Each structure stands twice: as C-alpha cells, then as structure tokens.
C-alpha cells in the first residue's frame, strides 16, 4: 500500500511539474513579440531615404520632408529648458540606429499632413512596421488619430507584451488621474466622479480632478458608463487656464479629449 502511494505521489509530482512548466512557457511565449500577429505591409506607398531622426516618432527625409509616424506617440525630448520625458532618448536612439541613412518604405495616411506640415505616414524598414516594433518594446503608446486607423487593431495589440512585462513607458503607466499636473500626452486611470451631457458630447470627470470630453459620435460605444466606474483613457491633456482666466463652477482645470474609441476603456 505504501509503495502504491509513493508511485502515485511521484506521478502527481511529475504531472504538476509538467503543468507548471507548460504555464511558465506559455507566459513567456505571451510576452514574446513573435507571439503577436505582424502588421501587414500595405501597397500604395513610396521609397525614401531617412537622413535625420528628431525623436522617437519624427524623421526627416533626404528630400527635406519631415515625417510623423502614424499610430504611436513616444516620450518628448525636452526643449526650451524643459527636461526630457522618461524614455525619450531611448526611443530616439532606437529609431536612429535602424533607419538613419537607410532606405525605407513610407505609406501616407488618409489624412496626409498634420498642423505642423509634417507628412503623416506608416514607416517600414525591411518590410517591418517600425511603430509596431517600438510598441512591442515599450518605446511608446499606440494611438488612433482621425482617419489614419487602418492598422490601429494591429498596433494596439502590439503594445500588449510590453504592458504585461511593465517595460519601457509601461513602468510608469497608467498614471492616476489625480496626479495630472501638466499638459501633454498621458495615459490615465481613475474613477468616474461625474458625467455631464453637453451640446456636442459628454464631460466625464475622473476623481474630481481631470475631465474627459467624449464626442457624441463616440458616446454610444460607452453608454453603459456610470459614476463609480473605473476607466482608463489616453490622449493629450490641456490646461484650461492657458485659454481662459478662470474656471466655471464645477469645471476641472485639466481636460483630455477622447479622439478615438480605443482611447477610452473600462478598467
């Protein structure tokens, strides 16, 4: 009887080791960029040479044209006496090592130009979408802006490994809504403290500190949100006091406008 129990324990122990090894292997496979579908190489673009890298998401071509990468926002390099955001130099160096002096393939967006006159385009190097590779390593956040969303599903999926592993920008994100104290890009998390309907959409206050503006065209996708829910949002924070002398009653100083459905998620 004792020997039978020992054999059973040995078999059970071996089975547990095999199961444990399986889950450990599956976990690391999940974190591997190779486990995620590669963004497709789309037709309709052109070849060009990159001669300068400004930062992690902007380059200059030999023609002189500046290009802003679609689908990603990387930390800002400090200018005019302001410090670099964490990870800014790392993202810039990564991009420079791969594309400076190289022939690349550029696929312009449906919206081809931003307000600074930069060409908006997907940038491929050796048939790989650069934004996808950067997101996989936590060098920036995925974005869906305007009509330039053809590869949004793929790019938002690409940031998952870095997020799970808390790599790069995900070491400090999401930020608590209560911590917002300056303009600029942010990925925040907070609890809904108030929802107010406006003429063109909804204002959603998080922790009585940060207001999100949700356009009416996106409101239907988030109709079930209610006070007390925890949500996550990403986008550019504005300081209302830079545009107006004082705040109206109940108005939050910090405002983040939701520009795409993917930028607002239940948490």
Feature map (PLM): residue ranges:
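Small beta-barrel nucleic-acid-binding modules, primarily SNase/OB-fold domains
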Residues: 2-11, 33-267
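Positively charged N-terminal leader segments that act as targeting/secretion signals
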Residues: 10-26
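N-terminal targeting leader peptides, primarily classical Sec-type signal peptides for secretion
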Residues: 28-32
